[in-house]
Amino acid sequence: MLKKFFKEISYKKSYVLAFSGGLDSTVLLHMISLYIKKIKNNNNFFKKIFKFRAVYINHNICKESKYWSNHCHDQCLKYKVFFKSINIFISDFSEGIESSARRERYKALFSDLNPEEVLITAHHQDDQIETILLSLKRGSGPRGISGMQSIKKFDSHIIKRPLLHCKKEDIKLYAIKHNLNWIDDKSNLNIKFDRNFLRSEIIPLLKKRWPNIGNTISRSAKLCFDQEKLLNELLKDTLNSLVEKDKSLKFIELFKMSEIKRFAILRKWFCLNNFKMPSLSQLKHIWKNVIISKKDSKAEIKINNNIIKRFKKNLYFIPIYSKNHLKNIIFKTSLNHSKKIVLPYDLGTLITKPIMINENFIKKINFFYYNNKKKFIFLINLNYMKKMSFTVKLWILFIC
């Protein structure tokens, strides 16, 4: 297992381990510490350019989380690995505890990554089986059944899973052999959660009946991944011709396609925007109630934390943000009346234009201060009702 691991890791990279203190990530931490010793013994120059640290995400859900953070810190101290604990607080559980925690965990990990760093996770073959079985339960297509990949690019970041082809039993034997100390999270025994149910009740039965099922499921996942990759190649040119610079989708050409190709294009558009794959019923709803609905209707559908909306001949992804989230955004930019100002979080673009104002207008303006001393910007928001059935918001900014 160590030989395979050393082949997966390059001393030229900078790595960040998602460290929970559990069995799997503890084994991975130990393996990396051995790798550091190995390259140090070979050449001290390698040690200098190989960078590695561990990050623990405290979800603040379990009362033991503080203890777990301390345990992870002690383990990293033992191996002389830089450690960081990040606190997150989940306010939206609409996707369920597991999915919501996973979403916020990865958001925190990616936010902490430097551009040159690769995120390492301790997912193994049994995790892959769970993921694929859950995809089958949801009725997923080839992309879902392809499961996790040993290397995956997500936006500008890379995730590496060097233990993905290792069996859970082998990982535990490794931990016992090296006398490792890890955390057993009792919540993993709660079978009301689907993943725990599969882990505790279903997968042991499958392995007992078919001992090699982990390898065969992984092989099927690889075949599905190859099919999905081929589909991407075949649809690439068509998709590129339909997607605008703002990532909106021109849907007129979809009317000329078969339903199979049309839905495949829509799925690829979701992937391009890094959003969760829609179900078949959601795709049908987008087509029937958004794309081909009446022009004067409010053609939109809410999927997770986004709204799919039609405007003229294009489909748009519009993120849903809470008012509190938007209030906390600090956005700095140089103001030039001849340029457009692109707002963060895909909130749109401001077109700047100089205007004449009077004294009464100035009295309505809100003042913002920098360090409570230097006045640097005025901001006002006015609503204008047009004859159309929508509201236009005008933001006026001044530099003092």
UniProtKB/Swiss-Prot annotation:
Keyword Nucleotide-binding: yes
Cellular location(s): Cytoplasm
Major location category of this protein: cytoplasm
Reactions the enzyme catalyzes: cytidine(34) in tRNA(Ile2) + L-lysine + ATP = lysidine(34) in tRNA(Ile2) + AMP + diphosphate + H(+)
Keywords for the protein's UniProt record, in alphabetical order: ATP-binding, Cytoplasm, Ligase, Nucleotide-binding, tRNA processing
GO biological process: tRNA modification
Coiled coil ranges: none
GO cellular component, one term: cytoplasm
Keyword presence, Ligase: yes
An example molecular function term from Gene Ontology annotations: ATP binding
SUPFAM superfamilies: Adenine nucleotide alpha hydrolases-like, MesJ substrate recognition domain-like
Residues involved in ATP binding: S20, G21, G22, L23, D24, S25
Catalytic activity, EC: 6.3.4.19
Domain comment (free text): The N-terminal region contains the highly conserved SGGXDS motif, predicted to be a P-loop motif involved in ATP binding.
Purpose: Ligates lysine onto the cytidine present at position 34 of the AUA codon-specific tRNA(Ile) that contains the anticodon CAU, in an ATP-dependent manner. Cytidine is converted to lysidine, thus changing the amino acid specificity of the tRNA from methionine to isoleucine.
Family: Belongs to the tRNA(Ile)-lysidine synthase family.
Protein name as catalogued: tRNA(Ile)-lysidine synthase
Organism: Wigglesworthia glossinidia brevipalpis
